[in-house]
Structures are given as C-alpha cells and as structure tokens.
Amino acid sequence: MKAAEIREKFLKFFESKGHTIVRSSSLVPGNDPTLLFTNSGMVQFKDVFLGAETRPYSRATTAQRSVRAGGKHNDLENVGYTARHHTFFEMLGNFSFGDYFKRDAIHYAWELLTSVYKLPADKLWVTVYHDDDEAYDIWAKEVGVPAERIIRIGDNKGARYASDNFWQMGDTGPCGPCSEIFYDHGPDVWGGPPGSPEEDGDRYIEIWNLVFMQFNRDAQGNMTRLPKPCVDTGMGLERIAAVLQHVHSNYEIDLFQQLIKASARETGVADLANNSLKVIADHIRACSFLIVDGVIPGNEGRGYVLRRIVRRAIRHGYKLGRKAPFFHKLVADLVAEMGAAYPELKEAEPRVTDVLRQEEERFFETIEHGMSILEAALAELDAAGGKTLDGELAFKLHDTYGFPLDLTADVCRERGVTVDEPAFDDAMARQREQARAAGKFKATQGLEYTGAKTTFHGYEEIAFDDAKVVALYVEGASVGEVKAGESAVVVLDHTPFYAESGGQVGDQGVLANAATRFAVGDTLKVQADVIGHHGELEQGTLKVGDVVRAEIDAARRARTARNHSATHLMHKALRDVLGSHVQQKGSLVDADKTRFDFAHNAPLTDDEIRRVEAIVNEQVLANAPGIVRVMPYDDAVKGGAMALFGEKYGDEVRVLDLGFSRELCGGTHVHRTGDIGLFKIVAEGGVAAGIRRVEAITGDNAVRYVQALDARVNAAAAALKAQPSELLQRIGQVQDQVKSLEKELGALKSRLASSQGDELAQQAVEVGGVHVLAATLDGADAKTLRETVDKLKDKLKSAAIVLAAVDGGKVSLIAGVTADASKKVKAGELVNFVAQQVGGKGGGRPDMAQAGGTEPAKLPAALAGVKGWVEARL
C-alpha cells in the first residue's frame, strides 16, 4: 500500500465515522507566534482544546504537515542517520472536542489498523498509563488484546505524571493519560517491548499515540476533571507506511525511494543506501513546504532554520561530489510525489524552485573556501592525534563563511571529531557584545527606576498641562535636579510623548513651566511602561516634583503618523501584489519617510511598484476611518489581525483597522486614510538574502518629490528643445544621432589606423626571418588596435607585433604573432613582457593577446625592448 493510499484511507475512514476532514494548517503557526513551527496535528486545534475557540464540528481528522528542526523539537542532527528521524513528516490524526472519548478512540484505532490496513492483531502491542484502568479494560475486555501485550507505564521521568504515557500541553492546562500502539517486527529484529531495558531496539515500533485529555492542571499541580474531555491522536504517515510496506526504515517506503532516486540522479551516486541521499531526500520536503508557507532563508528565526536545512543538504551533495547547484532541481520530483495531496505545493513550484536556486548559488560562492579551511584543520588535527576542533575556528566558519555550527559538527562527526562548543559560544558572546557596543546608544539604557509606570495620553492629546517630574537622570545617574545646559532624561507621571517602539521613532517637543524649558530630542522607554524624555534643559532648573506642561511637536507627529499608517497599507498591498509569503521583517518610521523590510526573494519590477502605489493611493482616496480597538490577543488574531513572529504581545492588544488593513499596533496613526495625502515609493533594494527593503514618503514630502521630478522633466525637455510630453521621443532621436556619429567616428579611426598601418609596416625590423614591430598608434581604441595588428600580420607575412595606445593615463596593448613564428614567440608572453613594464598584465592565445597598464611614461622604453626579447627566443 503506497503512502498516498495510506493517507487517503485514514482520512476517509474517519470521515465515515462522522469526522470533518480539515486541511493541513501552515507550518508557520497562525495562532501562536511563540511556536517556531507546527510540529503536531493538535497545533491548529490548540485554542479549541483550551476552550478559547469553537468550531462547527466536534470531530475532526487531518493529515498535518509538520516540521521538527530548531527550538525544543529538533531532529536535524539525527536525520539521515537513523531509520525514523525527519525534519518534515506528516502526522495523521483524529480529534474529539468534547464528543467521544477513550472507548470510541480505541475502537476506531483498532478497526483501522486491523480491518482497513489489515495488520495482524497478534503483531500489535499497547501501553497505558499505569493507573488508567479504564483504558486497560477497554483494550483487554472489549478489544481483546491479551494481557501480556498490554503494558502499564508509570512515571518514568522522575516526577509525578512525568511519563511517556502522560501528556500535557504545558505546566498548567489540559492534560491526561495516553495509550500508545506498537508494532512487533518479530524476533529476527533486536529489541524489547516498551518499558523493558531493550525498548530502544527496532523490534517494537510505536505507530500511534492516543491522548486522552481528561484533566486540567492548576499552578499548584492539582488535577480536576474536565467537563468535556477531548481526544488528540497522532500517527506518523512515514512510520505506518514502513510497517505496511514491510520495511524497517522510513527511508525505504515508496515516497522516500522516489526522492532518493531523484537525489541519486542529481548527484551521480549509484548506491541508494547512501546516508547523504537520505538527508537530501528528507530536506527537500522540509525546505519546499517551508517556502510554500512563506518562510524565506535568512539569518534569524524560522528563516535561519530553513537556511541551515538547505545548507546541510547542499553540503551532503558536495560530499558526494556535486560541486554545482542541484538541490532546487528536486522540487519537481517532490511535486510529482506530493502535489496531488497538497495542491499548494504544485501552485508554488516555480517560486520554491527559484528561492532554493538563489540560496544554493549564494552558498556555493563560499562553500569551497570554507570546506577547504575545515578539511585542512581536520587533517592537521588528525596528524596531531586530536579529537576536538577548535571552537574559535568553528565560529570563524560560522561568522565568515556562513557555516552553521551544526553543519561543521556534522562534518566533524563523520571523522570521529567533536567541536569545542563552549569556545564557540564564548566567541559568539564576544561578537554580540562588540555589536552591542558599536550599536546606537540609548540614553535610557541602564537606568534604575523603581517608581510607578507612566500614563500615556498620546493617542488622544498632543499636550498635557499637569505632568509631574517623578525622576531625573544625568549621565545614567539618578539626580534630584537638572541645571540649564545639562542633558538629561526626564520621567513624568503622565505624558503625551510616544516612546520609540515598533519601528516608530519617539516624539520630540518641550517640557516647560513659567521658569523652566526642557527641549525633548527623543523619547524612549526606560522600562516596558515607563517613558523617558531625553533632551537638554535650555532654561531654569528642573527638579523632581516639578509640574510642567508636556507638549509634543505636533507637526512632526502628524508627518510620522502619515508614514506609519502608509506602512500598514503598503504591507497589505505588497501581500496582494506579491503573495501571502510577504511578511514584515523590520521597519523604521519617522517624520521624513517609512522604511519597510519584508520577506521576498526577488527585486520588485517597475510594474509591481506601480501596482503597490496604485493600491495604497486608492485606499488614501477612499478616506476610510482608522478604527482602534483593544481586545484579547486571541480574539484579535482570530479576527484576522496580523501578528508578527518575534513580537511580544500581552493578553490585551491594540488592533488598528485602516482601510483594507488590520494589524496589531501600538503606534500613532492618522484618523482617516485621506490624511496620508499622497503615497510614493522612492527606493527599493535588497538588504539580505530573501529580504527586500522599500522606502516611501507621504503627504507634503511626496508632493515636493513629485514637483521636483516634474521640474527635472521640464528642464530636460527644455535642454533638448522638446515639450515634456515629447521627451522620450526626443531622447530616442538623440540616441540615434549619437549612434550614427559613433559609427562615423569608428570608420574614421579605422581609415586613420589603416593609413598609419601602412606607415608602420615600413618600421618593422627583420630578426631571424621574422618582422618585429613595436609602436604606438595614436587615438586608437582596442578594436582598432586588433584590426591594425591583423592587417599588419597579413602584410608582413611572418611577424611579431606589439601595438600600443594611450588614453587618459591608461595603456592599451595588443600583440599579434603569425602562425609560423608562434611556436617560438607566444603573443601572450610578448604582451605580458611589455605590460609588466607599464604597471599591468595580460594574456591570450599564442597568435593574439591583449593587456593594459597604468604607467604610460614607461611605454617607450618597454616597446624599445621588444626587438631584443623576440631575438632571444628565435
């Protein structure tokens, strides 16, 4: 039974039992930014189990795409070296949300395995939690599993409920016992049943885990029964396929065999049992589906994990002798195997292929150098009898050549060598400290503040009359007063000043009363809820306890708000134009512009930029209101608000609806989209692999920018004596004229060179039957020099010629040697002889070569030496 049929039979079986088939969710968890990747079937139902979400069904079944690489669940190191570890796998599951419980879950599992998949009942063993008598009795008395094949597993991990057979979502929350089903491969395979000292052998293989969520665990560890217990089961498709196809390794199933054969084809390897082929076959699945779900290779977070997987696959191909990009070519083979089950893979095939190709090309630019350094170090280590690679070298490979530590460790492991990871960590820590020291210094860093939080009024007000000074800092130290001319940080109990956060710069403005004026140059966070006003006291003395009027620069705030709101609209427009893989990777919003970094693997075309601008300006013209709501985080995400991975959100979040955009945001914004005025993209480029940057301006800045463009167009039109509307046509005419004149000039140079060539032929000196000529051809370019040399060779019949020209301090050289003389006099050697004397070098064929130089003053002497150089070789 093929893997595709196994998947289909599983889903159809549970559909026949009243389950709704739910499509696989994304590998990027949409409801949990703290989770790196979707790693099990229950992830998309987490809020349902917690009671925070309801679905229109109480029974569900899925084939969930899952990844375990990076973070807590990381199988990367073992992939390719064991029979059952993968970075990507499919988890088949059935779920009950307060519907059926243990009895039905157990009977369903047994019926599917024995009646649908036709597994022999006497090959199946089960485990239960040691005091779960209910599950034990169902297996023994209802299903009929003999007692010797039902094993009770206790708390085998050092604490109460710490057991292979007790599942918990976290330290608190839903939890409960589980029952695992094992397949016995028979006595010919080493290993013992679960719970025995030999349980790690390959004879008894876990194929299905049935989790019974029946308790809620509180912070004190107390267990209370859930009013509606739930069921969460998981069976790895690859594992059950290995059992049903009578093989002992997941890599021997049909799905993997096709990918392994494709990997062998691309690497030129005949041995299909090679572990490196298994690595490549596994990794193409993980990499392709991660890219399908919007992850782009990068240097942090999910992107960094993807980059590590890609580079590990490339390194294994390199190890097999494949020294050029090959990995991306396997996408088509993966689509052939899995495209029917996952149409999104087939749809994204061109983009996935392109992303992988670009990543391969980047890595191959550095891999050879890095590998040569590592190989040399390992050879030296082996000669010295060492078994530990220097951590500093491992860090250099990581930092300079893009080798992740685990890739270096992989190479070392094959040689029986370990990496000094503590030394690597020390080097990494030093670099981070240096980066911090070199980074922008924040005036609020290191301030010790223990008072009350600041109340922020900036969403509603631009000034606050009765703000009280609660703390003052000068050069990082807490002080009681600040004198005129001193720079300081002021903390108020109330403020309208927005502190730099979420990419938006802090406000500027003034703190003042009748006797004091403090100019605020920046506003920063001292702590999460404490705002510091950094600036200089221009007048008077400011003391703790003073009351001031806090007033922001309203015009600057308004320009910043326009740019911030435009960023939200641009983000949505980019996703509409380029695809849902576009995700914000960074931003800077100030009064002059917005700078937006996002995941995308290709430069934006002019048409794409125009479309983004048109969409944003359409939203501006709609003059839609900005609607702000504060709500629970879960409600916001369920309502479609974008939550960005890596951002920290509290239980309550601020949601901004602006036109067609909905995002979580704590920044300041316009009241209506029309307040943005005009939106214009002024720059687009790449900042890192897979990361693009767009800069845009709004409002009066955009108007001035367009006016300046208009002025330049008018000036250019006037200079070319044309109307602005005729400018492109006029430029085309001028270009045609230039081409015509250049052609005429070339013809003149050719005629001049021809006439000079006739004169030069008379200067040739015969040496040993060969005419030797070394001369300067005034005003000639490289093309003219070559043509003249060819004509002289024809004219002189047997010759060795060097012609030179000087233009703008640079020397051009062409050497030509006729066929009869080129056995002894090589044109490449001849031109190099001259070039080396004029500060250059060159080379070419024995009959024709060229070179250049930077010291024209030495040219006469160099040419004078040609006769003697040729004579010495004849």
Swiss-Prot record:
Transmembrane segments: none annotated. SUPFAM superfamilies: Class II aaRS and biotin synthetases, Putative anticodon-binding domain of alanyl-tRNA synthetase (AlaRS), ThrRS/AlaRS common domain, Translation proteins. InterPro entries: aa-tRNA-synth_II/BPL/LPL, Ala-tRNA-lgiase_IIc, Ala-tRNA-ligase_IIc_anticod-bd, Ala-tRNA-synth_IIc_core, Ala-tRNA-synth_IIc_N, Ala-tRNA_ligase, Ala_tRNA_ligase_euk/bac, DHHA1_dom. GO terms for molecular function: alanine-tRNA ligase activity; aminoacyl-tRNA deacylase activity; ATP binding; tRNA binding; zinc ion binding. GO terms for biological process: alanyl-tRNA aminoacylation; negative regulation of DNA-templated transcription. Its cofactor is Zn(2+). It is an enzyme of class 6 (ligase). Its main location: cytoplasm. It holds the Pfam family DHHA1. Its EC number is 6.1.1.7. It is found in: Cytoplasm. Zn(2+) binds at residues 564, 568, 665, 669. Binds 1 zinc ion per subunit. It catalyses: tRNA(Ala) + L-alanine + ATP = L-alanyl-tRNA(Ala) + AMP + diphosphate. Keywords: Aminoacyl-tRNA synthetase, ATP-binding, Cytoplasm, Ligase, Metal-binding, Nucleotide-binding, Protein biosynthesis, RNA-binding, tRNA-binding, Zinc. GO terms for cellular component: cytosol. Consists of three domains; the N-terminal catalytic domain, the editing domain and the C-terminal C-Ala domain. The editing domain removes incorrectly charged amino acids, while the C-Ala domain, along with tRNA(Ala), serves as a bridge to cooperatively bring together the editing and aminoacylation centers thus stimulating deacylation of misacylated tRNAs. Belongs to the class-II aminoacyl-tRNA synthetase family. Catalyzes the attachment of alanine to tRNA(Ala) in a two-step reaction: alanine is first activated by ATP to form Ala-AMP and then transferred to the acceptor end of tRNA(Ala). Also edits incorrectly charged Ser-tRNA(Ala) and Gly-tRNA(Ala) via its editing domain. This is Alanine--tRNA ligase. It comes from Burkholderia pseudomallei (strain 668).
